[in-house]
UniProtKB/Swiss-Prot annotation:
InterPro entries: DUF520, UPF0234-like_C, UPF0234_N, YajQ-like_sf. Keywords: Nucleotide-binding. This is Nucleotide-binding protein SYNW1816. The lineage of its organism: Bacteria, Bacillati, Cyanobacteriota, Cyanophyceae, Synechococcales. GO terms for molecular function: nucleotide binding. HAMAP family: YajQ. Coiled coil: none annotated. Belongs to the YajQ family. Nucleotide-binding protein. It comes from Parasynechococcus marenigrum (strain WH8102).
Amino acid sequence: MASTSSFDVVSDFDRQELVNTLDQVRRDVGNRYDLKDSNTEIQLEETELVITTASDMTLQAVEDVLRAKATKRNLSLKIFDFQTPESVGGNRVKQVVKLRKGLSQEIAKKLSKIVRDELKKVTVAIQGESVRITGKSKDDLQAAIQLVKSKEDELDVPLQFENYR
């Protein structure tokens, strides 16, 4: 048995769940009476969504449907970074929604500082887009998990725990 235990804190989402969510949103938009004739398009790209629709009102309705469907499929709403809508030709509105994935250096440093200040028995190492927390006892790691969960709202990114060993 190893003398130390560790886990990784990451910020990720299930891409297939996002694809399924967007399929449900498209189906919902096609069936809703107020959105049926809006000619709404939702495109998924590698790091963002692009929503193109008829007006600001229909854009807001599509955003609400997207949030509701994502919540039902257990996707955190923190993965969506809604940019400001912009006008495109022919009275249409386009909005880019960035998808947050991975921990930025700034957030990783903030997270590591929080854990280091509160818990002295664990060590924190930033590894690219994740943070590894190592400790001698599993109880210390459980305390670290509880601490990170309690501070998740301050960090404004969805956090998951992986590789608990």
